[in-house]
Amino acid sequence: MKATKMRNRQIYQASTRTRSMQVGSPLSKELRAKYGKRSVRVVEGDTVSVVRGEYKDIDGKVSHVDTESGSVAIEGIKKEKGKGDKFDVLIRASKVVVTGLNASDSWRMKKLGGTAEPAAKADSEDAASVGKAEPEDSGIDDATEPEQAGAAGAESHDAEAPREESK
């Protein structure tokens, strides 16, 4: 099979979990600096800004996420049918930028917040440890270990030697 057929098969016959992961959008520069992540899975209630296509520069809240097509419906973006009825326009998740997060899901917010803080803590610890020249004592005396290992090896060698002589 050709590579394009294999790629299309992976995309269009993907599992529900894989499709859900494909509905991701990049974060705005402010959110990227705050959370330390580049992209996030879009959920209902997130505030997004369209960056490509006919509806470029329109902001709104996500009203519906369609994992089957990898698209999102945004409040305020609708089209009109011939009879006058209005329907939501689906926009690809990759064509929007997340400008505000729906904070109602505590697990999601904890997972997002967990990446930015340790990096900041690690930088402060590195700065504090630059002045230290002496490594911390681990409580194990390295000098005694080789001697003990050599003594144990010598004992076992001595124990084997008399056996050879007695034969």
Curated annotation (Swiss-Prot):
Pfam families, sorted: Ribosomal_L26
Region: Disordered, residue numbers: 1-27, 107-167
GO annotation (BP), single: translation
SUPFAM superfamilies cross-referenced by the UniProt entry: Translation proteins SH3-like domain
Record-level Gene Ontology MF annotations: rRNA binding; structural constituent of ribosome
Biased composition (Acidic residues): 136-145
Keyword Glycosyltransferase attributed: no
Gene3D superfamilies registered for this protein in UniProt: 2.30.30.30
Function field: One of two assembly initiator proteins, it binds directly to the 5'-end of the 23S rRNA, where it nucleates assembly of the 50S subunit.
Entries under PANTHER family matching the protein: 60S RIBOSOMAL PROTEIN L26 FAMILY MEMBER
Membership in a protein family: Belongs to the universal ribosomal protein uL24 family.
Name used for this protein in its record: Large ribosomal subunit protein uL24
